[in-house]
């Protein structure tokens, strides 16, 4: 028993709309809204790579179907953290991308106001979004695989002494933040790594 809080629950299967529904919808609108959801998870077991950080196979099929039917696509990310977004640049139909996060019970109402133009997100990007997961400096130290507890990195792997509470649960995931001052955009700028979306970005075409 190495887990005391939470248990990872995979995302439910994605709904696959029938072809006739897509055909009918594309006859009366040229715009599609796709909401990509992720569960918030539990403590120490929030994320996985397959079907979580990356799109699932079902989601990939749905994305291709949407882009094949609608020339304008808006994507809303509804989850507790970032995911791989390399597919956004690969589909020219995607013209808007909004990170909604986990906004709570009033989230849908706020989203509706943004979508119809009643409100403006009015914020600059507060994080750097990498092109590849390996571009994040903390990735190699991110210990997440609780399905294989013996592969989890512990305090001892970093030469650290665990706090008393963690000495009972030897295989609790530990991530060592060793970036020093090179956090976020400082790391990408200092080491010449081109991000997918830079931190603090407003727009590239403003006067």
Predicted regions and their residues:
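C-terminal non-catalytic regions of proteins with extracellular/luminal or membrane-system context
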Residues: 1-207
